């Protein structure tokens, strides 16, 4: 799933990538709630561990609850070499992440405020100790800002 989702994002299919990631994440969460643990891998078409998967094992199966949550569901993706950070906002609920590593020296805090609808322009509060370019995406719209060290709302 991770490889397919990444390929879809690279080809501009953000909505489909989000839907697949969200479905996979939700299924992993259901399995966790039912069994109390994470598994080595998961069944591709059912809400259950994969055939002969080991419990209490976070290998490739850890991509959904960690990377999938941050990169696809929260939409936080970085390109440190170009000093760019993207927040692709799909949720209407408030969410955020503190101490997101940005390269060797940077830490970034991101807080996305709640919205009344998916079409409403998101407000993103960003705290960074390094300069970067922030792009906020929602639907077919986007806004970009140059972020200086400190806190600002975009």
Residue ranges and their predicted role:
Residues 99-154:
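C-terminal beta-sandwich/jelly-roll accessory domains of carbohydrate-active enzymes
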Residues 1-103, 109, 113-117:
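C-terminal capping/lid segments that line or modulate ligand- or cofactor-binding pockets
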């Amino acid at each position: 799933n991770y490889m397919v989702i990444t390929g879809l994002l690279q080809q501009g299919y953000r909505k489909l990538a989000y839907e697949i990631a969200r479905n996979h994440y939700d299924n992993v969460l259901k399995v966790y709630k039912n069994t109390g643990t994470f598994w080595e891998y998961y069944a591709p078409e059912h809400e259950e561990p994969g055939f002969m998967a080991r419990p209490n094992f976070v290998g490739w199966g850890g991509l959904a609850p960690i990377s999938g949550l941050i990169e696809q569901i929260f939409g936080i993706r970085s390109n440190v070499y170009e000093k760019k950070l993207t927040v692709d906002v799909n949720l209407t609920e408030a969410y955020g992440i503190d101490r997101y590593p940005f390269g060797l020296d940077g830490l970034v805090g991101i807080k996305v405020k709640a919205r009344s609808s998916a079409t409403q322009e998101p407000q993103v509060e960003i705290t960074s100790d390094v300069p970067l370019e922030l792009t906020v995406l929602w639907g077919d719209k986007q806004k970009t800002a140059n972020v200086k060290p400190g806190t600002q709302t975009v």
